[in-house]
């Protein structure tokens, strides 16, 4: 795992000395995030931040928030986007979501909310386009692993998926 974290930090995003790094991930990945953050620092990062995303909360947001709230962008979120557009941190997206995590939610409501948010966030995303380093890396989560290896226990499925990723 250490080698994988090093590969992401040094080749995936190619950290520049003093650069800020943001790791977008699920809370299930705390152990790997710790390894990855350390490898980013060893590669020269000036600051490493974890941006936690929790799919069960997203599911509840879709279910209970009004379309206006769900499609809105808070002032602090917009300020963070502005900061990112100005400072161009390296972004690491750790993909480990439950493939079925949003099943049964109102997909039309979710799509409309994402479109509304995009109208607000687009100028910041456009400002970053082709100007910052980013990397998407797979990190097995239990539900994803169980989807791939349903006959195995959660832990065994996760270990097996790690084996395939690290080949």
Predicted feature locations:
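Active-site bordering "gate/hinge" segments
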Residues: 1-167
């Amino acid at each position: 795992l250490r080698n994988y974290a090093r590969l992401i930090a040094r080749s995936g995003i190619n950290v520049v000395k003093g650069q800020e790094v943001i790791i977008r991930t699920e809370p299930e990945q705390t152990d790997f995030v710790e390894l990855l953050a350390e490898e980013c620092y060893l590669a020269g990062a000036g600051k490493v931040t974890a941006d936690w995303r929790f799919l069960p909360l997203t599911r509840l947001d879709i279910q209970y928030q009004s379309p206006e709230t769900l499609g809105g962008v808070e002032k602090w979120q917009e300020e963070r986007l502005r900061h990112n557009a100005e400072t161009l941190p390296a972004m690491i997206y750790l993909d480990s979501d439950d493939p079925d995590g949003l099943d049964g939610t109102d997909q039309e409501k979710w799509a409309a909310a994402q479109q509304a948010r995009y109208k607000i966030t687009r100028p910041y995303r456009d400002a970053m386009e082709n100007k910052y380093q980013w990397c998407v890396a797979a990190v097995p989560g239990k539900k994803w692993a169980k989807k791939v290896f349903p006959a195995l226990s959660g832990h065994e499925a996760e270990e097996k998926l790690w084996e395939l990723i690290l080949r």
